[in-house]
């Protein structure tokens, strides 16, 4: 094998030997095991063993008739510390330079070419049972990385990386991409590649790694990691649209809606897709049958070919690349993000079999054998200890089947829509019925109109809606259990649920893309419902229509529309964002988009994250102050309301009693927690059910806390015990009391320190009325602007610095020697601004990862 000295030891949790007995094997399987083990021993992969460790083996027959040896290493995996990920995603192949030459190789039997650390080999021993105990059992242990060992992929990646390191150092201009056992080398000059390739083969051979000669690709085009690399582009190997499920009008409507949405990107003229669109014509019922015509098949093949040719171009060396600091690049993350894929198995698998039955199944069934060796988690047969689950185990429960999964051929077809003006409408057989509601959310209005339809049509029913929110909610409500009154839509959901459960006939609800421009009865019905809400909405909202016309002419800001036409901020902003001329100039959303408090304790976000390595204390409850950035976390044994209350009491006793915002988890919406908040006089807010609002700040806090737990692991074990509570306390101490921002303040400083001066009062000029107003207090100063809180307004306003003047009483204090602020105030005597930033009240964006910690939070100012 060679390179044994470079093999990597595995960290173990215990030195206690583990023995899992080998189960009996049939004569046929025993013969196959003996033959396979002899072959592996001859190749140097196995050696005889007298180890006190043992785990079972078995064999499965492949489709080709050959046998495959499997080793059940789940028990051994539980005894080892898992290595962290060393390569968390696939390399981005479009980063390869254009027109460079390639050599692609594949390492043959990579795992079996890498030696196992000698001291670790006894742990991977197994037994070949003798028939009828006629002789001592033969025992062997692996000398190479075994299949199924949890750390084998990581050790393989690190081992191959070390083997490639001399080539990387010797040929610095050579691009070397390595992923598991696949290697790609790339260079502009073919001569350099031809010189590097034999040295690469020789270096790999010194490490005991052999390349598969039949898989070597030497050209400017090749297949690598599921993609085809050409001199100019990266293309997928094969794309085909699934067609076997396309049978009804509803099926084709969904497919063609997506194709029509993608058509401009694929640069396909709509005339070329007319045979496909013609399939939507005819019988109007959504369950009416549809079949492909030869012309439609050709049109769909055109779409598949266009998808196949939708290539990613490789990197041109002559192209100028703009580099941005991390904080600046965040708004461009959608555009400049790398293609990265992550995956994670569940921690446990619940099956209706005992441990002995699972072992029997693994010994007799090939499918079970593959499962138990490939699944790294725990296989159990105990459901969580929950009263509802225990009741379901003891009592036969039949879930209602009112909401159908397929269109109902004999059902009435109804199209629904709702608008923000409170107007809802539904269309049945070209007849439009409208109804006005006292709501401003389109989703809520559409929920109400769907409820109206459910009550008006008791027979078989097909509902078509352009709101994914409503479609998903209706499909979930039938088996959602008890809905607690945690928001203003809970009552509507309760009524929809009751209407579904009381129905004798089934109902089918489906989604259709709005404003698709496609032909056919489904698009026509949706357009009729949509126009019904818009026509009446125009008559009901003359102010909004006038504002649209005014903006269409002058393209003024949303704030101007709000003041001039007495609109809400939401209405004014929608007019601006829907303008085709203005949309490309709108500011990009940034990291501070989540609602934040403008002072400590004004808004906390709270959530639960899971850290499996903590064992029973894996449920870590986290709270973060959205103003100061102070974080508090409590590792507990559950996430019920009682644990949430325990976390709240500990957090509030340390940092004060806040207003809190959470998601709609069962613990947060429970009667027990609501009663607790009332008793403690704490305001608790949640988002809409089935439509959770952003909890981005606390989600980033989860990531930050976990990163510090990883970074600080082992740093305090020589002083303090390595237990979850100590680890969490150490991380919180660092985040709250050590990490500083640009002003030298920690999160604890920002949370506890109050301004040592009174609010500065200024008079300010309203540009619309040309009148001076105030004096009013300043909350925040920024470069060229101040945030003023008018006493007669509901919210603060941003005013240009040049349109403000210090209040007369404060000017007099200034002349008399009194200090309105301090000697470093950035405002001159004439009311102008000297360019420095001072703080009336800062709202900080706390550091969330390593990059933020190097350049900690800048102030985020909110209106």
From Swiss-Prot:
It catalyses: DNA(n) + a 2'-deoxyribonucleoside 5'-triphosphate = DNA(n+1) + diphosphate; Endonucleolytic cleavage to 5'-phosphomonoester. The record marks 546-547 as: Cleavage. Residues 800-840 are annotated as: Disordered. Residues 408-538 form the RNase H type-1 domain. Mg(2+) 2 binds at residues 417, 446, 466, 530. Residues 41-229 form the Reverse transcriptase domain. The RT polymerase active site binds 2 magnesium ions. GO terms for biological process: DNA integration; DNA recombination; establishment of integrated proviral latency; symbiont entry into host cell; viral genome integration into host DNA. A zinc finger (Integrase-type) spans 542-583. Residues 596-766 form the Integrase catalytic domain. Zn(2+) binds at residues 551, 555, 579, 582. Its EC number is 2.7.7.49, 2.7.7.7, 3.1.26.4. Mg(2+) 1 binds at residues 106, 181-182. It comes from the Viruses. Reverse transcriptase/ribonuclease HThe reverse transcriptase is an error-prone enzyme that lacks a proof-reading function. High mutations rate is a direct consequence of this characteristic. RT also displays frequent template switching leading to high recombination rate. Recombination mostly occurs between homologous regions of the two copackaged RNA genomes. If these two RNA molecules derive from different viral strains, reverse transcription will give rise to highly recombinated proviral DNAs. Belongs to the retroviral Pol polyprotein family. This is Intracisternal A-particle Pol-related polyprotein. It comes from Hamster intracisternal a-particle H18. The lineage of its organism: Viruses, Riboviria, Pararnavirae, Artverviricota, Revtraviricetes. The gene is pol.
């Amino acid at each position: 094998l060679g390179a044994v000295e470079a093999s990597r030891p595995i960290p173990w949790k215990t030195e206690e030997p583990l023995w899992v007995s080998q189960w009996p094997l049939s004569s046929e399987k025993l013969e196959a095991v003996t033959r396979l083990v002899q072959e592996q021993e001859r190749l140097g992969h196995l050696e005889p063993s007298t180890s006190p460790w043992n785990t079972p083996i078995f064999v499965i027959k492949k489709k080709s008739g050959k046998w495959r040896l499997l080793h059940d290493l789940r028990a051994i995996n539980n005894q080892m510390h898992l290595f962290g990920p060393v390569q968390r995603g696939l390399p981005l192949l479009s980063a390869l330079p254009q027109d460079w030459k390639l050599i692609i190789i594949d390492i043959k039997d990579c795992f079996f070419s890498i030696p196992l650390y000698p001291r670790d080999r006894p742990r991977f021993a197994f037994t070949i049972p003798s028939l009828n105990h006629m002789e001592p059992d033969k025992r062997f242990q692996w000398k190479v990385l075994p299949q199924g060992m949890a750390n084998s992929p990581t050790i393989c990646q690190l081992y191959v990386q070390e083997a490639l390191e001399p080539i990387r150092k010797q040929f610095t201009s050579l691009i070397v991409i390595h992923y598991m056992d696949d290697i790609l080398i790339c260079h502009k000059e073919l001569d350099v590649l031809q010189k590097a390739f034999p040295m690469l083969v020789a270096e790999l051979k010194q490490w005991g790694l052999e390349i598969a000669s039949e898989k070597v690709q030497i050209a400017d085009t090749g297949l690598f990691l599921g993609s085809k690399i050409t001199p100019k582009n990266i293309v997928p190997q094969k794309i085909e649209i699934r067609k076997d499920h396309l049978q009804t009008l509803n099926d084709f409507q969904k497919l063609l809606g997506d194709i029509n949405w993608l058509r401009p990107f694929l640069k396909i003229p709509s005339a070329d897709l007319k045979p496909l669109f013609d399939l939507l014509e005819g019988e109007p019922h959504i369950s009416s049958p549809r079949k492909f015509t030869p012309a439609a098949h050709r049109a769909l093949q055109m779409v598949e070919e266009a998808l196949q040719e939708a290539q990613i171009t490789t990197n041109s060396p002559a192209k100028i690349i703009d580099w941005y600091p991390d904080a600046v690049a965040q708004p461009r993350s959608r555009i400049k993000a790398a293609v990265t894929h992550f995956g994670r198995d569940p921690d446990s698998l619940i099956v209706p079999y005992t441990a002995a039955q699972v072992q029997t199944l693994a010994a007799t069934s090939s499918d079970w054998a593959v499962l138990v060796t490939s699944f790294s988690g725990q296989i159990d047969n105990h459901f969580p200890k929950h009263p509802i689950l225990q009741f379901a185990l003891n009592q036969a429960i039949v879930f209602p089947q009112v909401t159908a999964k397929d269109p109902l051929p004999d059902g009435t077809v109804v199209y629904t829509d709702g608008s923000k003006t409170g107007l809802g409408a539904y269309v049945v057989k070209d007849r439009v019925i409208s109804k006005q509601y006292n709501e401003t959310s389109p989703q809520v209005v559409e929920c109400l109109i769907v409820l109206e339809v459910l009550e008006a049509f008791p027979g078989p029913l097909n509902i078509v809606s352009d709101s994914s929110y409503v479609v998903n909610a209706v499909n979930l409500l039938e088996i959602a259990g008890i809905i607690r009154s945690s928001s203003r839509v809970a009552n509507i959901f309760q009524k929809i649920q009751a209407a579904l459960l009381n129905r004798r006939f089934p109902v089918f609800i489906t989604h259709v893309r709005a404003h698709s421009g496609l032909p056919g009865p489904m698009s026509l019905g949706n357009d009729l419902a949509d126009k019904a809400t818009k026509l009446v909405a125009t008559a009901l909202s003359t102010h909004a229509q006038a504002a649209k016309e005014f903006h269409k002419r002058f393209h003024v800001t949303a704030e101007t529309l709000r003041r001039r036409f007495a609109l809400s901020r939401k209405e004014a902003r929608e007019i601006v964002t829907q303008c085709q001329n203005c949309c490309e100039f709108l500011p990009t959303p940034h990291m501070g988009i989540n609602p934040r408090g403008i002072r400590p304790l004004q808004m906390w976000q709270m959530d639960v994250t899971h850290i499996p390595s903590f064992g029973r204390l894996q449920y870590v409850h986290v709270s973060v102050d959205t103003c100061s950035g102070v974080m508090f976390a409590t590792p507990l044994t559950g996430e019920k309301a009682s644990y949430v209350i325990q976390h709240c009491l500990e957090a509030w006793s340390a940092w004060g009693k806040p207003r809190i915002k959470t998601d709609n988890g069962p613990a947060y919406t429970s009667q027990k927690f609501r009663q607790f908040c009332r008793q403690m006089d704490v305001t608790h807010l949640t988002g809409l059910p089935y439509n959770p609002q952003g909890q981005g700040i606390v989600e980033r806090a989860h990531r930050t806390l976990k990163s510090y737990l990883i970074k600080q692991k082992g740093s305090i074990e020589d002083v303090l015990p390595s237990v979850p509570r100590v680890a969490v306390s150490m991380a919180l101490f660092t985040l709250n009391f050590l990490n500083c921002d640009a002003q030298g303040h920690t999160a604890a400083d920002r949370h506890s320190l109050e301004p040592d001066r009174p609010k500065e009062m200024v008079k300010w000029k309203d540009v619309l009325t040309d009148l001076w107003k105030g004096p009013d207090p300043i909350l925040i100063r920024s470069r060229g602007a101040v945030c003023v809180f008018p006493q007669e307004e509901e919210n603060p306003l941003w005013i240009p610095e040049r349109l403000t003047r210090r209040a007369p009483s404060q000017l007099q204090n200034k002349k008399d020697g009194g200090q309105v602020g301090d000697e470093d105030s950035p405002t001159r005597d004439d009311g102008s601004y000297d360019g420095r930033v001072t703080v009336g009240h800062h709202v900080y964006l706390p550091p969330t990862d390593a990059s933020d910690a190097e350049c900690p939070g800048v102030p985020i100012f909110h209106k």
